């Protein structure tokens, strides 16, 4: 009987491992796809040569965790590149700049500590560049990593081609990020409810096998009475 119960337990354990092994790669691929699509599309709209978004950012989470210090350098280099026009061709619209309202919006974001530290320095160092076309600054956290790698990679591999995203495109990225987060929550709920029957069935079978009421004191199952 112990051998039988162990074999049943091993059987359910193998089934659970099989379903987990088949679901986890799909879930991991879906997770990477959801987080990569916005960064990939952003690089396509920027049309940056000599750069593949998937090689630069495995996931959007990694892109946004690039670090406050690197982002601060990006802000300065972004404005400096717009001032010198080293990276941008002269036949396209100017690179969108930063306005004081941008910093007000960013003060409520996760970049607030470093933004407040660099605010006065940037405002005093690049006063003319702040008059460029303003962007939706709440989306700067999404655009900044792409611009940062675009600009610095151009210094290493040659000039890059810039096509600045429009305000409509930036609004699209914001809505897509909100949509993606809601889809992630919905998919997690669906996956949870899909796993509940399997886990419940394994638990019931395991408790039935390990229930002491089905065993006698000698460890054998009671025989049925023959009428």
From Swiss-Prot:
Regions crossing the membrane: 178-198
Disulfide bond residue pairs: 48-137
Compartments (UniProt record): Virion membrane; Host endoplasmic reticulum membrane; Host Golgi apparatus membrane; Secreted
Membrane protein topology class: Single-pass type I membrane protein
Cytoplasm keyword on record: no
Taxonomy, superkingdom: Viruses
Keyword Transmembrane: yes
Family the entry assigns: Belongs to the arteriviridae GP2b protein family.
Described function: Minor envelope protein. Part of the glycoproteins heterotrimer GP2b-GP3-GP4 which is probably responsible for the attachment to target host cell. This attachment induces virion internalization predominantly through clathrin-dependent endocytosis.
Protein name: Glycoprotein 2b
Organism listed in the record: Equine arteritis virus (strain Bucyrus) (EAV)
Highest classification ranks of the organism: Viruses, Riboviria, Orthornavirae, Pisuviricota, Pisoniviricetes
Name of the gene this protein is made from: GP2b
């Amino acid at each position: 009987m112990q051998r039988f119960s162990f074999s049943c337990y091993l059987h359910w354990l193998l089934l659970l491992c099989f379903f987990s092994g088949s679901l986890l790669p799909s879930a991991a691929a879906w997770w990477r796809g959801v987080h990569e699509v916005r960064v990939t599309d952003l690089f396509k709209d920027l049309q940056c040569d000599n750069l593949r978004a998937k090689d630069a950012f495995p996931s959007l989470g990694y892109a946004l965790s690039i670090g406050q210090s690197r982002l601060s350098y990006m802000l300065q280099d972004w404005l400096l590149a717009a001032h010198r026009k080293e990276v941008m061709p002269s036949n396209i619209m100017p690179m969108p700049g930063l306005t004081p309202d941008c910093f007000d919006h960013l003060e409520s974001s996760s970049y607030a500590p470093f933004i407040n530290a660099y605010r006065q320095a940037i405002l005093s160092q690049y006063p003319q560049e702040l008059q460029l076309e303003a962007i939706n600054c709440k989306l700067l956290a999404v655009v900044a990593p792409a611009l940062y790698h675009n600009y610095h990679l151009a210094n290493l591999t040659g000039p890059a081609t810039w096509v600045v995203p429009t305000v409509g495109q930036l609004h699209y990225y914001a809505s897509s990020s909100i949509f993606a987060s809601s889809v992630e929550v919905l998919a997690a709920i669906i996956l949870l409810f899909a796993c509940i029957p399997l886990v419940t069935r394994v638990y019931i079978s395991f408790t039935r096998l390990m229930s002491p009421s089905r065993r006698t004191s000698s460890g054998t199952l009671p025989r049925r009475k023959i009428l």
